[in-house]
A protein has these predicted regions:
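Local sequence-structure signature of Cys/Sec-based thiol-disulfide redox active-site neighborhoods
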Residues: 10-46
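Generic recognition of short, well-ordered alpha-helical segments
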Residues: 33-36, 64, 68
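Non-catalytic, surface beta->alpha helical segment in thiol-disulfide oxidoreductase systems
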Residues: 78-106
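N-terminal leader/targeting and pre-domain segments
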Residues: 2-18, 104-106
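Non-catalytic interaction surface on structured domains
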Residues: 38, 48-50, 79, 93
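Thiol-based oxidoreductase modules, predominantly thioredoxin-like and allied folds used
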Residues: 47-62
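Structural micro-motif
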Residues: 67-77
Length: 106
């Protein structure tokens, strides 16, 4: 296998292990803006396998998330195996910074 192919395969494996949790609420304009940027970022071909979970902090079953982030949404957790704590993005999202974090190796 060529070195380029090996790098692409390794990057693909890294991206498959990235999981995202997007904490939001329906009445939040910042959340809507962040969601648009997140969706646009995830449309890139190399992010097609990234897992995204959206958590509406206003739903009763998400009360722990509400207690933690009621004044801080939107919040995005970037998790991957071997990482002790998620990387967090809060309030304003930047497409280039998100993409760089999704591609980062731990």
């Amino acid at each position: 296998m060529k070195a380029t192919s090996l790098r692409l395969l390794a990057r693909s494996n890294i991206l498959q292990q990235v999981s995202l949790t997007f904490f939001t609420k329906e009445t939040c304009q910042l959340c809507k803006n962040a969601g648009v940027i997140l969706d646009k970022t995830l449309q890139a071909k190399d992010f097609s396998n990234v897992k995204l979970k959206t958590v509406d902090i206003m739903k009763p079953e998400n009360s722990a998330a509400f207690d933690k982030y009621c004044y801080d949404v939107p919040v995005l957790h970037v998790d991957r195996p071997g990482q002790k704590k998620p990387v967090k993005f809060m309030h304003y999202f930047d497409e280039e910074k998100l993409a760089a974090e999704f591609r980062r190796e731990v």
